[in-house]
UniProtKB/Swiss-Prot annotation:
Catalyses which reaction(s): D-glycero-beta-D-manno-heptose 7-phosphate + ATP = D-glycero-beta-D-manno-heptose 1,7-bisphosphate + ADP + H(+); D-glycero-beta-D-manno-heptose 1-phosphate + ATP + H(+) = ADP-D-glycero-beta-D-manno-heptose + diphosphate
Subunit structure: Homodimer.
Residues reported to bind ATP: 195-198
Alphabetically ordered keywords of this record: ATP-binding, Carbohydrate metabolism, Kinase, Multifunctional enzyme, Nucleotide-binding, Nucleotidyltransferase, Transferase
MF (Gene Ontology): ATP binding; heptose 7-phosphate kinase activity; heptose-1-phosphate adenylyltransferase activity; phosphotransferase activity, alcohol group as acceptor
Protein name as annotated: Bifunctional protein HldE
Record lineage: Bacteria, Pseudomonadati, Pseudomonadota, Gammaproteobacteria, Aeromonadales
Length: 475
């Protein structure tokens, strides 16, 4: 399955659930305590990260989505710390702060990246009035593309059926990371993402792939779901839907350091991808890739679009061809992480001819990746006159993307690509013709960034205008 990253910035993701604060105390262990046979950790570094539903929202925001987080906290220092962290990553938080409850906090003591102890500070919110959070959900739904329910069984989601009903009535898909064995409360959700242990706790021991699919399909029908995605650790993931063949996705992890928060990454990537316009199959495949990245990190972590682009490049040599500006910037960042030299050129390329092909082949040889920025129809018309272009923007870009020398093709609507060049900042900017480098649009921006601007010669005797003239004469 070929995957191109969507424009995550368009996605609006609402996350509701059990928010937590994860704290990590790091330090060496050089001796045993004289008070008891336990190691003494000399704490040298303290770290705090959002956990639970907060980590789900953090993962969506890390992809570039507009994330909103709703949940229950105490009126304490931990809630302030959590809110401050989320504000720092531009996640909009609207917590119900309760005076009689502590914010759920999990403190982990680590030495040499090995967890020695975990301390939990929590009291379940099971007796809290559900309307307090429901009112906030109703306010947030109209400005959301998808809703995630992140259930850790701590009590924030004590009216799951009501939340699902309101979201589905508004036409908003609901993805649920379930907890426990009572799946009845998730009836009518769009998709559930249980791990294998959670799945078997509901359906019983699974005996092979066929049994997995059969039992999964029974759950889909029983609880009126659109789909079920079972995450299976080293066995990857399986997507199950009624009336469609199952989709098995092999695990992508190369090294596993910590599975903490991997489920959060899966559901956030899946939901954000769907909100950005991907199909369910594509979104599941991308979530699988994200899971393979995050388990290679210590603790609850996030995955960036650049990391995804790099992983996709490694897996399938994809992410090339016609792109939006946002997609291009991610691809360029990923290329730079791989140490690749990025070359950029631009033009109308109205009727592609041998001169164009030769020029682009020569430009491509100057680096590892070649970007071709193409004037849109309106831009060409302003530059060339009312009779141009002959071919539309989409057609011109499709032809360019088919050339072996070209990696990425992107449109620009202005008369010059100066703004786009300033955003991309290629290592080498090339232009064909009789220009002086200093006269080329983007020269100042590229050279100020340490890049180079170079002029290449066009092949003699090749001209789009001449071709058009010849066609008209022979017309």
């Amino acid at each position: 399955m070929k995957i191109t990253l969507p424009e995550f910035g368009k996605a609006r993701v609402l996350v509701v659930g059990d928010v937590m604060l994860d704290r990590y105390w790091h330090g060496p262990t050089g001796r045993i305590s004289p008070e008891a046979p336990v190691p003494v950790v000399k704490v040298e570094h303290i770290e705090e990260r959002p956990g639970g539903a907060a980590n789900v929202a953090l993962n969506s925001a890390a992809l570039g989505a507009h994330a909103v987080l709703l949940g229950l906290t105490g009126q304490d220092e931990a809630a302030d710390a959590l809110a401050g962290q989320m504000a720092g990553v531009k996640v909009a938080c609207d917590f119900v702060r309760l005076a009689d409850y502590p914010t759920i906090t999990k403190l982990r003591v680590l030495s040499r990246n090995q967890q020695l102890l975990r301390l939990d500070f929590e009291e379940a919110f099971h007796d809290v009035d559900s309307t307090l959070l429901m009112n906030k959900v109703e306010q947030a739904l109209p400005s959301s593309d998808v809703m995630i329910l992140s259930d850790y069984g701590k009590g924030a989601l004590n009216d799951v059926p009501g939340m699902i009903q309101r979201a589905r009535a508004a036409g908003i898909p609901v993805l649920v990371d379930p907890k426990g064995t009572e799946f009845e409360k998730y009836r009518g959700a769009t998709l559930l993402t249980p791990n294998m242990s959670e799945f078997e706790a509901v359906v019983g021991k699974v005996k092979g792939e066929e049994d997995l699919v059969a039992k999964g399909l029974a759950l889909v029908k029983r609880f009126e779901l659109e789909a079920l995605l079972v995450t299976r650790s080293e066995n990857g993931m399986t997507l199950i839907r009624e009336g469609q063949p199952e989709l098995h996705l092999p695990a992508q992890a190369h090294e596993v350091y910590d599975v903490t928060g991997a489920g959060d990454t899966v559901i956030s990537t899946l939901a954000t991808s769907l909100a950005a316009g991907m199909s369910l199959d594509e979104a599941c495949a991308l979530a699988n890739t994200a899971a393979g990245i995050v388990v290679g990190k210590l603790g609850t972590s996030t995955v960036s679009p650049v990391e995804l682009a790099n992983a996709l490049y490694t897996e399938q040599e994809t992410g090339f061809g016609v792109m939006s500006e946002a997609q291009l910037k991610i691809a360029v960042q990923a290329a730079r992480l791989r140490g690749e030299k990025v070359v950029m050129t631009n033009g109308c390329f109205d009727i592609l001819h041998a001169g164009h092909v030769s020029y682009l082949a020569n430009a491509g040889k100057l680096g590892d990746r070649l970007i071709v920025a193409v004037n849109t129809d309106g831009s060409v018309r302003r530059l060339k006159g009312p009779g141009r272009p002959v071919n539309s923007t989409d057609r011109r870009m499709a032809v360019l993307a088919g050339l072996g020398a070209v990696d990425w093709v992107v449109p620009f609507a202005e008369d010059t690509p100066q703004r786009l060049i300033a955003e991309v900042l290629p290592d080498l900017l090339v232009k064909g013709g009789d220009y002086k480098p200093k006269d080329i649009a983007g020269y100042d921006e590229v050279t100020a960034n340490g890049g180079e601007v170079r002029v290449l010669n066009f092949e003699d005797g090749c001209s789009t205008s001449d071709i058009i003239k010849t066609i008209r004469e022979r017309g």
